[in-house]
C-alpha cells in the first residue's frame, strides 16, 4: 500500500569510498517535492555534523565546510532565506536545523542536477549505465 511518504537517501564518501549511507522513508507526507527535499536535507545535515565530529576526533582537519549536493533549488532557497514563509510555514521547526549549520558555514550546499546525484542509486531504479557509474563513484566495483 502506498502511504505517499517520500524516501530520502544520502551517501557520504571519504577517499572515494562510501563511509556512511542511509535510505529512509520520511516520517510525514510532504505536500511538495521541495518540502520532501528540505526534510531529507535536515536528516543529511545531522549525519554530516556527526561525521565531522567523528573525523575531527580522529585528527582530520575539519576547518572547511562539508559540501552537500542538492538537486532541488527551491529547497536550497528555503535553507538560505528564512523569510521564504509561504513554503516553510508548515515545515516542523526540527527540520530547520539545516539552516543553522549552513549559516554558520559548517555545511555548504551545491546544486547538483538529478542526473548526477550519486545517492539516487539508493532511492531510484536507474538505467544500467547510471547504476554502474554511481556504484563506481562510491567505491563499489563489479567483480569479474
Language-model segments: what does each one mean?
Residues 6, 18, 24-144:
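RNase H-like nuclease module associated with reverse transcription
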Residues 1-16:
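Acidic, metal-ligating active-site segments
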